[in-house]
């Protein structure tokens, strides 16, 4: 089976991530329902609709309850994979739809701070997409694993997953390919200033492919705009900036992202503001960083995201050495009250 061959290769490239056959593993732990019988295009459509409903919810108010709901639905829907199919094409479409739902579930778990569950769902998405021959979704789920590894500071795993996402990049449409290069750039940036030339080359590739976009992308990529590209490039450069690299490039990208996002608070915009506050606090202007930090905190009334929390914790750590500045001291105090586990003495 091509899925198992691919996953064996994947397992050998990711030291910290345990890959067996994630489809079989997930099904073994899924909520078991009566045998689904015959599965057709109607069921495939229902799974796609669920994925898109939860994706819309994910772009709104995200939290632990939403993540629990989508994982439960994924577990129940996974039973359809044991059904009977009149045509092989229907079976492959179901695996593709299940990969989309699993990827959404993984992202929501990641954002809720449930990292173990996020990893399991991303791996399930990789397995389903590989079985379906859905190269774009396979790359997206692998890039999710790369982001998860970056978040955990797992440099080797981040780079392995990001590079695996770019295998046969020629099969990916331009904007999807651009996103994969931003994930690769971020993993390279995490690996240190000595990888700066490679990181910058990856960001250049991302810009070139994004500019070549024709609109012929998977529906789940429709959300991705120039603002997201600027933010993702800025986040890749952030790792370099706070470790001795040039901060101005990261600041310019993140500021462009903040300006390009709609005025309404959103997770993407708030994350860009928090990242901009981090690099600014770390390198050159703590007073302005404090203003940015307050702006990000204000947005948390409507944006709940563990990833934003993590970015603000980095602002708090960077702000500790500037605590004699009144504006920074005020921000530090507010961060200590707003973010669990961030009190720093």
Residue ranges and their predicted role:
Residues 34-345:
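Conserved binding/catalytic microenvironments
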Residues 1-44:
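Compositionally biased, long intrinsically disordered regions
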């Amino acid at each position: 089976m091509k899925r198992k061959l691919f996953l064996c290769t994947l397992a050998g490239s990711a030291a910290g991530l345990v890959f067996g056959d994630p489809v079989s593993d997930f099904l073994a732990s899924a909520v078991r329902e009566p045998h689904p019988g015959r599965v057709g295009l109607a069921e495939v459509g229902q799974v796609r609709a669920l994925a898109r409903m939860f994706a819309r919810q994910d772009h709104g108010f995200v939290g632990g309850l939403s993540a629990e709901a989508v994982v439960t639905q994924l577990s129940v829907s996974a039973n359809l994979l044991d059904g009977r199919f009149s045509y092989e094409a229907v079976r492959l479409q179901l695996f593709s739809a299940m990969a989309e739902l699993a990827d959404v579930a993984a992202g929501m778990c990641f954002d809720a701070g449930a990292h173990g569950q996020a990893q399991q769902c991303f791996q399930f998405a990789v397995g389903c997409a590989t079985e379906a021959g859905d190269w774009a979704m396979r790359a997206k789920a692998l890039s999710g694993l790369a982001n998860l590894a970056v978040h955990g500071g797992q440099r080797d795993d981040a780079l392995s997953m990001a590079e695996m996402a770019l295998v046969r990049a020629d099969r990916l449409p331009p904007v999807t390919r651009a996103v994969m290069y931003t994930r690769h750039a971020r993993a390279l940036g995490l690996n240190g200033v000595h990888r700066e030339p490679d990181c910058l080359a990856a960001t250049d590739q991302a810009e070139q492919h994004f500019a070549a976009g024709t609109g012929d992308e998977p529906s789940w990529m429709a959300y991705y705009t120039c603002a997201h590209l600027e933010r993702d490039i800025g986040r890749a450069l952030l790792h370099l900036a706070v470790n001795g690299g040039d901060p101005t490039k990261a600041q310019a990208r993140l500021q462009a992202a903040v300006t390009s996002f709609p005025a309404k608070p959103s997770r993407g915009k708030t994350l860009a503001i928090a990242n901009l506050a981090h690099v600014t606090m770390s390198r050159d202007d703590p007073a302005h960083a404090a203003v940015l930090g307050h702006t990000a905190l204000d947005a948390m009334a409507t944006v709940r995201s563990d990833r934003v929390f993590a970015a603000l914790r980095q602002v708090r750590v960077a702000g500790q050495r500037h605590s004699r500045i009144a504006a920074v001291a005020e921000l530090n105090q507010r961060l200590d009250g707003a973010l669990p586990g961030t009190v720093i003495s």
